[in-house]
Amino acid sequence: MRRRSFVRGLTATTAATGLGLTAAGHGHATAAAGGGNRPAGNARPRAAAWREVPVPAGEPAVLLNAVAAAGPDLAWAVGEEARSGSTSGRPLARTWDGSAWQATDVSHLAFAGSLRNVAAAPAGAAGAVAAWAVAYDRAGAGHLLAWDGATWREHDFPGRGESGTELWAVAVAPDGTVRISGTRDGGSRVLRSDDAGGTRWSWSPPLPTDDGTAPSLWNVHVDGAGATWVSGGVDVARYDDRAWHVLPRLAGLRLSVTDLLPTAPDDIWLTGHDYGAGGPPGKPPGVVLRHFDGTAWSDVAAPFTVGSLGAIAPDAAGRPALIAGWDFWDGASAHYLRWDGTAWTSERGPAAAQGVTPVMSALAPIPGTGGFWSAGTTAQSPFPPAQARIERYG
């Protein structure tokens, strides 16, 4: 699913402010506003049915930005390898064959950069491409990729190769048509396929913003009614193929939105982190979890407050189900949140090896199973020796 990588968010924050998490530890570093020490008596919940699943290593630093599943026997994870801080490396892809994750050869992709996002077509979508991915080229171009059964191949789209045209995230509607958030002609837009095979494409009008800027739309989703939802910066909006409907702007001093889950126009969930005002180098962010009720955004209590929430995933009915998080005070395992119908409750992933800090930035439900894939990296910062990490529930 599409979701902005926590590590990528850290990189953007570091580039803009000189802050990052490289100096953060698990004990006495300065917390973000609203954080503080872990409350006494807040015991670590058991790991439930989570387990780590081996994934082929790449050249560090390795980041998995997104994961998507077509079913129990086929899934895709995408990202990059050979990254160093804010300098992108090379595209990296992995494929689940029903028994193990395999390395996917993408050496034919003749660009340096990152595979940003991946989305799978739903079962039964006539004529649909099995999966789509979007990529970032360090030279400044956007790339659309289609799965051909063995690897990822470049796919044509209007604006391909144009300076200033960028593709951020991808989603597939129930009928197999595709929605991509991107930038073209100086505006933030949605690129839509008119057919499931991706032979005809059209761009939306630009997203209207209060300040006239064009935010990077890191997140895109299609709701049950077929409307496209996007988020970027402090902007969240819905495009119904006729017009934009912009929600109230998000409050936050140094806010990064990592993911978005719209279930209805009056039921929208949002995850991320916010560094707040001031603080020394190495200050960790505070968790952001918000809900929109059709009128206003409200903060929702999370089981931990210092760290980041990296992704949110629905259940088979499209209802909120699971959030992946990184807990600053206890980073020895991923800190998941599960929706019980009234509140988000703690659920821990498998314990990591010494020196490994799981930062899970992507989630995907596994159709037909009730399970989930979770993908990310093994360190707080995008430097060697960070490697890919994949966990599975169910």
Label the model's feature ranges.
Residues 5-25:
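N-terminal export signals
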